[in-house]
Regions:
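Phosphate-binding P-loop
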Residues: 1-7
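Hydrophobic anchor at the beta1->P-loop junction of P-loop NTPases
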Residues: 12
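The conserved Walker
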Residues: 16
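Conserved lysine of the Walker
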Residues: 20
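Conserved substrate/cofactor phosphate-moiety recognition/catalytic segment
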Residues: 25-68
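Glycine-rich phosphate-binding loop used to anchor ATP phosphates in small-molecule kinases
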Residues: 58-114, 123, 129
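A glycine- and Lys/Arg-enriched "phosphate-lid" helix/loop adjacent to the NTP-binding pocket
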Residues: 99-170, 183, 187-192
């Protein structure tokens, strides 16, 4: 993970209807960052349907391209943060839930540990599930994907994994405080003995 560019990349993950997109928008505005719309959301809007199993790599590729472009823009504009609305780890969770396919797990987990300065995990607790035809499935799906994500985040460094619950205001305040602390740690650099 490159922390020398001045911009830190943050994955904002969670199951459907957990406030990821709104939180990314709030954090980008409040913490001098950039964000991009979730590639899966864009894909579904463009195609008018959810992806099939064989189309999952297309979603991951779009995510990685958005992250690369986003980091280039964050650096060019002197931003402190890039907030990634979702991550390949979420695609892995959806692949498991909808297709019983764990084939993305190891790659997504390795990529995640190596490429994000922090992970904001948006929990379902505190936010009601809100229907969004074509984009969201059900409260049952939200809970099932949440449980899969809990399993997938276990290998992530606990100091860089921030769990968020409550309303959007509480999530924003806790995330902001946590990320400001993290940014200070990166600015100080590694401690030497």
């Amino acid at each position: 993970m490159d922390t020398t560019s001045g911009a830190l990349k943050v994955a904002v993950i969670g199951a459907e209807s957990t406030g990821k997109t709104t939180l990314c928008q709030l954090l980008a505005a409040g913490l001098d960052g950039l964000h991009f719309e979730e590639p899966l959301r864009q894909w579904v809007a463009r195609k008018g349907r959810p992806p099939r199993q064989g189309e999952q790599p297309e979603i991951v590729e779009a995510q990685l391209q958005q992250e690369l472009l986003g980091m280039q823009q964050a650096i060019a504009f002197g931003k402190r943060w890039l907030f990634c609305d979702s991550a390949p780890l979420v695609t892995a969770a959806y692949s498991r839930y909808y297709f019983k396919d764990a084939g993305f797990d190891n790659l997504a987990s390795s990529y995640h540990r190596a490429n994000y300065a922090a992970t904001l995990f948006c929990l379902p607790q505190g936010l009601d599930w809100v229907a969004e035809p074509g984009q969201r499935d059900s409260p049952k799906a939200r809970e099932a994907v949440h449980q899969i994500l809990l399993e997938l985040v276990k290998p992530i460094d606990s100091e860089r994994l921030i769990f968020l619950s409550g309303g959007l205001k509480e999530r924003y305040e806790f995330a902001s405080a946590s990320l400001n602390r993290l940014h200070s740690e990166f600015a100080r650099g590694p401690e030497t003995s």
